[in-house]
Amino acid sequence: MKTKLREMLRFPCFFTYKIIGLAQPELIDQIIKVIQIQIPGDYTPQVKSSNRGNYLSVSITICAKNFEQIECLYHEISKINIVRMVL
């Protein structure tokens, strides 16, 4: 799958992550903090709450210069303890 994704993308390109995490106030700040370290910029995430309000879905778009940035951010965002899934 990684090879196919790498072949499909032309850099620089916009890439959107969808992150599912616990509905805690610090979730969005922690995600943006991780992204700012790799790719500084002004980010406006789209946030939706789950039906029961236990989880948040955060969609955030970056401008990646290479595939390694996409992979690195995927792994770094996954390390946030209140993140449950990164797509």
From Swiss-Prot:
- Note the SS bond partners: none
The record's annotation in InterPro entries points to: UPF0250_YbeD-like, YbeD-like_sf
The GO cellular component terms are: cytosol
Q: Which NCBIfam families match?
A: PRK04998.1
Q: Report the sequence similarity comment from the record.
A: Belongs to the UPF0250 family.
Query: What protein name is recorded for this chain?
Result: UPF0250 protein BU488
Q: From which source organism is this entry? A: Buchnera aphidicola subsp. Acyrthosiphon pisum (strain APS)
